[in-house]
Amino acid sequence: IRGIFLTHGHEDHIGALPYVLQAVNAPVHATPLTLGLIKLKLEEHDLVSKTQLVTHHPGDVVKAGCFSVEFIHVNHSIADAVAFAIHTPVGTVIMTGDFKIDPTSEDGMTDLGRFGMLGKEGVYALLCDSTNVERQGYTPSESVVSESLDRHFKGCKNRIIVTTFASNMHRI
């Protein structure tokens, strides 16, 4: 194993990492926020000093054996999410990770231009996460959520208690 590549810092994507790293010695590649969350998790298992954590940004390309892994910006409910274009000897494999299309996101729009360019070049396989794909319609923009919260907050005279994913920093 030449490397472990993580798309974002949600628990369902990084939670098993301490257990994997007890069996596999490989560098961990991710974006800054994702690595920050990973570091906290590794501290719980006394693995930080034993693990090579490598910071990347959208647009970076990492060589891993005969593969190169390209980081592509995507929008998700956690900042610093990426997809991967894995360039292999037989073709390009795209792993989207979790993503959404939100043109008003504080974290920037998913890089549809790069996905389009890769599509024109030819994609051997697309591995695409698709939460709620069975629902009709589309996911509303975060700006709609923000407007709704503003209306409720302005009308409240006392305490307001709100719950949300702690990793959804833009909403917080």
Predicted segments with their positions:
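His/Asp/Glu-rich metal-coordinating catalytic cores
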Residues: 1-5, 10-172
